Amino acid sequence: MSVEVMRSVIEAAEGRVPVDTLFTNAQIVDVYGQRVAPGSVAVKDGVIVGVLYDGRDDAAGTYEATEVVDCQGRYLAPGFIDGHLHIESSNIRPAEYARMVATRGTTTAIADSHEIANVAGLDGLRFMIEDGRRAPISIKYMMPSCVPALPDEQAGAVITAADMQAFFAEHPGDVFGLGEMMNLPGVFMADPETCARIDAANQTPSKQVDGHAPLVAGMDLNAYAAAGIIADHESTIPEEALDKLSRGMYVMLREGTCSHDLANLSPMLLENPARARRCCFATDDRAPSDALSTGMIDNACRVAIEAGIDPVVAISMASLSTAEAFGLDHGCRDPHELRGAIAPGKRADLLLLDDLTFAKAPHRVYAAGALVAQDGTFVGEIAPEMAEVAALADELRASVKLPKLSLDVFDYAFKPGEAVIDVVPGKAITGMARPESAEGLRRIMLIERHGRGVSLQAEGADGDGPAGLGLVGKHIGRGWVRGFTITGGAIASTIGHDSHNVCVVGDNAADMMAAVEAVGQGGHVLVRDGEVVARIPLALGGLMSEGTAEDVAAQHDDFMVKARAMGIEPPLDPIMGIIFLPLPVIPTLRIRPEGMFDVTTFTYAD
């Protein structure tokens, strides 16, 4: 904080100059004092400069203000901070994402854009940063730490420690910290490149490294925490979360679209509520239809409260705990950077709530003192797209480069006892089965789409055989999945975490081929009897739509109806279900372009 800014804040805090906005008759959610108390809050230049509690501070008088907002007894809470998320998973660009989440009370998003980085490298990250600048809420971008997710993954880019350091030097302050460290073997083995990437975080404003450690325990967890990784959002049972808390890590309780872990983890907090101070919320991956209908971090608060967690504690986890995890809550710094509580010297990110049930969107949402949403409607401003953003967006189009494929590639037999992915609905983890028959199974394929297969095919990989058959086991993985009950057709997507190759699941070869052909330049496609019955176009990198959140939500809802009619039953989400099946950093069995991969042993499974 400069001396000039400090003096300005002090003058306003002392009441010697008028403030911009004074919130009166509020029930203030005090996350420091863990209480709700009546009072008023003064804001000047986007910063909270004064908090006066009724009774205790009556002798202090009040603030002169340009605008007085009578809260009429409503609750005034700090804006929510989403501790870990992937904007691309909502299938919309950053400015549109900000418009969507602001209506639900998210005023800060800690975004890891490793999805677009796996497709377009650092140019993809630059697009996210520049497009995000158009938004009134605060988006803090983390540098993707694992592009690709594993060293030999067939992604569209590679980002090394040296690349990170060069980007930090060229774009100082644009990247907040280092994103989730998914290369667990690299950490455990003290791999020099992995360690260099972790060390690169020291060039960022937060100097923090986010984590990703599903089922990690014992000495491996000790090594992970000792490396300086501050948080994890992958815990699925209380014992796992407590292991991480006890090693000094923050635990993010995830409540997304595919993964619903919060209720399962809540017993750890009910057993000892003091643990909540080191716990926060993350959505990770959230579909627009869910965001618009049930919310984002406000939804996590509701789930927590329904599980028995005190509302003030839930709000604290949604704000202060996350701010503390990333060092955003204290220090003699620019007050526009400090947040997580209603207290002097903090950014004026505020929620005006009718009650503390979170059954609906906040009555009003303020970001840096400016009204951005009211009763679920965005009323803020999104800046126009400038030439640089438009140019970066244009580079993300036409990202799907698939080889030529014949029907023979999709038509293969089941081998009794072979490794089969066992879907776990509502969870990112999968199981591994070895059934003796194909009853109840569906074919699954992963086709590299970043140009490797195209190049190898041009070199004669297929020989005189059917198109694409020479790529099987190299750039086309084939296998079987149980629990993905699509009937009479196929589903395909250009989203396949984290390298985003084309994944297709179906019960017959012809529809699987038709679905892959229909993917075009990106999106989700549902094919039945050779016809496309539902589609969500994702032109930007094959990950993001150029439409609104409402457009994508409507397409998603139609897709869901058609998918349910084809036998994909709840609780399995057909889209979130398929896009995580290739993810090679979460146990147990996954599909890669080379074949079926056992994450627990890091070997290919026959």
Predicted feature descriptions by range:
Residues E14-R16, Q34-R35, G61-Y63, G132-R133, ...:
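Solvent-exposed alpha-helices and their adjacent loops that cap or buttress functional pockets
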Residues M1-G39, K44, T103, L292-G308, ...:
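Active-site microenvironment of metallo-dependent hydrolases
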